[in-house]
Regions:
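Acidic, His/Gly-rich catalytic cores of divalent-metal-dependent hydrolytic chemistry
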Residues: 2-27, 39, 226-351
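N-terminal active-site segment of His-dependent metallophosphoesterases
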Residues: 2-95
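Residue-level marker for buried hydrophobic side chains located in beta-strands
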Residues: 44-46, 73-75, 101-102, 173, ...
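Active-site glycine-centered loops adjacent to acidic/histidine catalytic or metal-binding residues
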Residues: 49, 77-78, 104-105, 176, ...
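Short, basic, glycine/proline-bearing loop/turn elements
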Residues: 70-78, 139, 181-188
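Active-site neighborhood of divalent metal-dependent phosphoester bond hydrolases
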Residues: 86-164, 195-204
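Short aromatic-enriched loop/helix-cap "lid" or pocket-rim segments at secondary-structure transitions
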Residues: 112-117, 186-187, 254, 298-300
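Acidic, His/Gly-enriched loop-helix segments that form or flank divalent-metal centers
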Residues: 144-287, 292
Length: 351
């Protein structure tokens, strides 16, 4: 893998692999105060990769309703995807936009005025993703455009690409992709296995002046630890918090989605899959299982995407079996090695 300091135009400019210039921002953009309504939070839910799963959305809202204190729910992109039925599309968008929302590549391309835009699905897929997946994703996006009204497209276009939030003492950058692009793969679990790339990510944190980035986009969850030296010589732990997907399974044999919960109190329910403690022991970060009826969801999915359709070909196996990935792989120390779920549950930063 080649680590890059800045997001640069993809060598492959083909639809679905390119990363358009208007997707980009700088790590320095995050070195600002959070807006007032996202400061001093007790609980923050970050929901990425909902993918038009209305049943998962209902479950997210139920879980969030249980929370107390100063709380906010943020959908950080790709909340549309499988919702090709106009009624479902409208319901998903209406409920999502009642809360804080960012646009991912899906929403950005849905909002594009030029339906022939060469970005395709805007996924900026890396080279380990096959051409067939890329081509099918481009066609899924093209079909999804037919479900959106001009008014809905305008609402999507108005959404920001990133945001800042504070939970307790923790400064978070909220993104869809990574610290340089809404479709960046710099926070993918595959890339974060590479030591030189983790050094690049650490420099992004230095420039962004945040303690954590909460992200999604790359479809597999990872909580990756990074360290930074403080002026007084102490070591501070920072985190990439990637929830994988809320609307699809994230682990083999577990058909639940995941959301990232960042809070000043621990999560006590059985939905918790893994987590860490940071902010000098004051902030709990957990991956919460979004448990919806898998049979009902599969029936809904098949109505819009029957066998032989692009989404069915690309996603049916994952929806029914989950990816070849385990919870023990999802929480990693500064060397990129997995932490046990027990250690991850009790680990704290040194600052």
């Amino acid at each position: 893998m080649i680590a890059v300091e800045e997001a640069r135009p993809s060598v492959d400019a083909s639809p679905g692999r390119s990363c358009p210039l208007h997707y980009r921002y700088r790590p320095e953009d995050f070195a600002v105060e959070a807006p007032a309504h996202l400061q001093g939070l007790d609980v923050l839910y970050v929901v990425g990769g909902l993918y038009g799963n209305a049943l998962a959305l209902e479950r997210v809202l139920e879980l969030f309703e249980r929370e107390t204190g100063r709380k906010r729910l943020v959908f950080n992109g790709d909340f549309h995807w499988f919702d090709a039925d106009p009624d479902t599309f409208a319901r998903v968008q209406r409920q999502v936009l009642m809360h804080e929302a960012l646009r991912g590549n899906v929403e950005t391309e849905l909002a594009a005025l030029d339906a022939d835009d060469d970005a395709g699905c805007g996924c900026a897929y890396p080279d380990w993703v096959g051409d067939g997946v890329v081509e099918r994703s481009n066609r899924i996006l093209k079909r999804l455009r037919q479900a959106a009204t001009p008014e809905q497209q305008a609402a999507l276009a108005a959404l920001p690409m990133w945001q800042r939030a504070d939970v307790g003492p923790l400064r978070l950058g909220l993104v869809h992709g990574d610290a340089t692009s809404l479709a960046g793969w710099g926070f993918a679990q595959e890339h974060l296995q590479d030591a030189s790339h983790r050094e690049t990510v650490a420099r992004w944190f230095d420039r962004a002046r945040v303690d954590a980035f909460a992200c999604t986009h790359t479809c597999l969850p990872v909580f990756q630890a990074l360290t930074a030296d403080e002026a007084d010589g102490a070591e501070k732990r920072r985190w990439v918090l990637n929830n994988g997907a809320t609307g699809m399974p994230n682990f083999a044999g577990d058909r639940s989605g995941l959301l990232t919960r960042v809070a000043v109190t621990p999560y006590r329910g059985p939905e918790r899959r893994f987590g860490i403690v940071t902010g000098s022991g004051t902030v709990h970060v957990d991956a919460i299982g979004v448990e919806f009826d898998p049979v009902a969801w599969l029936e809904h999915f098949r109505r819009d995407w029957p066998a032989g359709s692009d989404a069915h070909t690309s996603y049916f196996e994952r929806i029914t079996k989950g990816p070849t990935y385990e919870p023990r792989e999802a929480v990693r120390d500064v060397a990129g090695q997995p932490l046990s779920c027990r250690l991850a549950a009790h680990s704290t930063s040194t600052r």
